[in-house]
C-alpha cells in the first residue's frame, strides 16, 4: 500500500521588474497562465459569477427576500403588492468589464518567504485576468506606486491581457520616501464613469485606512473583490534579537531589539489593523481574499471560490 502524496505547493514565479518586452518576463507569465488554468480548470468554467457570485447589471425576476440579501436590490413595487419583501434578481451581462486596481507601492517590494509580495500581486492579477477573459470580456488596470499611476484601457483579447500583465509586472519602484496612496488609486476608477462590472483591488492594505469612501462609491456600482497580499513579517516579528529595520515607503531606518514584549505588541497591532481592514472592506459590501507569500496562493483561491459558490447556492435555495 502506497501513501498518497500531498499536492505540490504552487508559488508564483519571480517577475523580476525590468523591460516590458523581456523574454524572461513573457515566459514567466506564460508559465503562470498555464498553472492557473490547470489548477482551476473545471472550477469556474469561464463563468465570472463563480468568482464573485452575485448580481449582474440587468434586472431580472423578483423573489422573496432572504436574510443577507442586498437591500439595494429591494423590489418595492412587488413588496407593496404582495405585502412580503421581495428582491430583484439581476441577470449577468454577457460581456463583463473587469478593472484591476493594483497597488505597487514600496511596501510590496518585500518578501521573506517564497516570493515578494509584488510577485504575489502580479500572480493574483494574472489569475483574475485568465479567469475573467472568456466570452469577449474586457479587462483594464490601474497600477499605482505612490509616485505615478499607469492606466491600461479595458480591452479584449489574449495579446491585450499579456500586455496588461507585463505593464503591471514592470511598474517602476517608487522613489525613496514616497508613500503609496490606495485611496487615490481607487478613486481614479470612478473617472470616467463606467458600465457596471467588476473591480478588483489588490494591495497589502498596510497603510492608513483612508480609502473607505472611494471603495464604498465603487461598490455601489460594481461588484468588488479585495485581494490582500501579505508576508509573514507583516503579521509577526522574528525572534532574532537586535535588528536594523527600514520602512519601505518612508525610507526611515531604526534599530530595534526584538524581545518577547515587542513581538507581542507588534502581533497585536498587526492583528488589529488586519481586522479593521477586513471590517472596512466587508462594510462596503465586498468579499476579502487573503493571500500570503508563505502559502499556496492558488489553493487559497480555490477555497475562496468554493466558499463563495456554496454561499450562492444556499442563497438561491
UniProtKB/Swiss-Prot annotation:
To M.avium MAV169. The lineage of its organism: Bacteria, Bacillati, Actinomycetota, Actinomycetes, Mycobacteriales. It comes from the Bacteria. It holds the Pfam family DUF58. It comes from Mycobacterium tuberculosis (strain ATCC 25618 / H37Rv). This is Uncharacterized protein Rv1480. One of its GO terms (cellular component) is plasma membrane. PANTHER family: BLL2464 PROTEIN. InterPro entries: DUF58 (IPR002881), vWFA_dom_sf (IPR036465).
Amino acid at each position: 500500500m502506497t501513501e498518497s502524496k500531498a499536492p505540490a505547493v504552487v508559488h508564483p514565479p519571480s517577475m523580476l521588474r525590468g523591460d516590458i518586452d523581456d523574454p524572461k518576463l513573457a515566459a514567466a507569465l506564460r508559465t503562470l497562465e498555464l498553472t492557473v488554468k490547470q489548477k482551476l480548470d473545471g472550477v469556474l468554467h469561464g463563468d465570472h459569477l463563480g468568482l464573485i457570485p452575485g448580481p449582474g447589471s440587468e434586472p431580472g425576476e423578483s423573489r422573496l427576500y432572504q436574510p443577507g440579501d442586498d437591500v439595494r436590490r429591494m423590489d418595492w413595487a412587488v413588496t407593496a403588492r404582495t405585502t412580503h419583501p421581495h428582491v430583484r434578481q439581476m441577470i449577468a451581462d454577457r460581456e463583463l468589464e473587469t478593472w484591476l486596481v493594483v497597488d505597487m507601492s514600496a511596501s510590496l517590494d518585500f518578501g521573506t518567504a517564497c516570493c515578494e509580495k509584488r510577485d504575489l500581486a502580479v500572480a493574483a492579477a494574472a489569475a483574475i485576468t485568465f479567469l475573467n477573459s472568456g466570452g469577449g470580456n474586457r479587462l483594464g488596470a490601474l497600477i499605482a506606486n505612490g509616485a505615478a499611476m499607469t492606466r491600461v484601457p479595458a480591452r479584449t483579447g489574449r495579446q491585450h491581457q499579456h500586455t496588461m500583465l507585463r505593464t503591471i509586472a514592470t511598474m517602476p519602484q517608487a522613489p525613496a520616501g514616497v508613500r503609496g496612496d490606495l485611496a487615490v488609486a481607487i478613486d481614479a476608477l470612478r473617472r470616467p464613469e463606467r458600465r457596471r462590472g467588476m473591480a478588483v483591488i489588490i494591495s497589502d492594505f498596510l497603510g492608513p485606512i483612508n480609502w473607505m469612501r472611494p471603495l464604498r462609491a465603487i461598490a455601489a456600482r460594481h461588484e468588488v473583490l479585495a485581494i490582500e497580499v501579505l508576508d509573514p513579517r507583516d503579521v509577526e516579528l522574528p525572534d532574532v534579537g537586535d535588528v536594523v529595520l527600514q520602512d519601505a515607503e518612508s525610507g526611515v531606518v531604526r534599530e530595534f531589539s526584538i524581545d518577547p514584549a515587542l513581538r507581542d505588541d507588534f502581533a497585536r497591532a498587526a492583528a488589529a489593523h488586519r481586522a479593521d481592514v477586513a471590517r472596512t472592506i466587508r462594510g462596503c459590501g465586498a468579499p476579502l481574499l487573503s493571500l500570503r507569500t508563505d502559502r499556496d496562493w492558488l489553493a487559497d483561491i480555490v477555497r475562496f471560490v468554493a466558499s463563495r459558490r456554496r454561499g450562492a447556492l444556499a442563497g438561491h435555495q
